[in-house]
Amino acid sequence: MSSLSTSDLASLDDTSKKEIATFLEGENSKQKVQMSIHQFTNICFKKCVESVNDSNLSSQEEQCLSNCVNRFLDTNIRIVNGLQNTR
């Protein structure tokens, strides 16, 4: 992957600059979602998995993890929707 210098970016037309800015915003959003999911999974793993004795999780552990992460995601979606409605 090649890198762009400041002079390269300055020489771009406004449309290209906007496209790059939009792309970067999208990538930042994706990164934030991935970080949140990682954080939720980590919290839920600590909550749901008491010990690692096997290479597989028990059905109770799997269900707990799934429910836990889904509740975190549901909560975040409600918060985002609430924030958007207040704007």
Swiss-Prot record:
Cellular component annotations (GO), alphabetically ordered: mitochondrial inner membrane; mitochondrial intermembrane space; mitochondrial intermembrane space protein transporter complex; mitochondrion
Residue interval(s) of motif Twin CX3C motif: 44-68
Ribosomal protein listed as a keyword: no
Disulfide bonds: 44-68, 48-64
Membrane topology of the entry: Peripheral membrane protein
Short name of any one Pfam family annotated for the protein: zf-Tim10_DDP
Complex formation: Heterohexamer; composed of 3 copies of TIM8 and 3 copies of TIM13, named soluble 70 kDa complex. Associates with the TIM22 complex, whose core is composed of TIM18, TIM22 and TIM54. Interacts with the transmembrane regions of multi-pass transmembrane proteins in transit.
InterPro entries linked to this entry: Tim10-like, Tim10-like_dom_sf
UniProt-annotated location(s): Mitochondrion inner membrane; Mitochondrion intermembrane space
Keywords for this protein: Chaperone, Disulfide bond, Membrane, Metal-binding, Mitochondrion, Mitochondrion inner membrane, Protein transport, Translocation, Transport, Zinc
Domain notes: The twin CX3C motif contains 4 conserved Cys residues that form 2 disulfide bonds in the mitochondrial intermembrane space. However, during the transit of TIM8 from cytoplasm into mitochondrion, the Cys residues probably coordinate zinc, thereby preventing folding and allowing its transfer across mitochondrial outer membrane.
Keyword Chaperone recorded: yes
Matching SUPFAM superfamilies: Tim10-like (SSF144122)
Any GO molecular function: metal ion binding
Protein's name in the database: Mitochondrial import inner membrane translocase subunit TIM8
Job description of the protein: Mitochondrial intermembrane chaperone that participates in the import and insertion of some multi-pass transmembrane proteins into the mitochondrial inner membrane. Also required for the transfer of beta-barrel precursors from the TOM complex to the sorting and assembly machinery (SAM complex) of the outer membrane. Acts as a chaperone-like protein that protects the hydrophobic precursors from aggregation and guide them through the mitochondrial intermembrane space.
GO biological process terms held by the UniProt record: protein insertion into mitochondrial inner membrane
Family stated for the protein in its record: Belongs to the small Tim family.
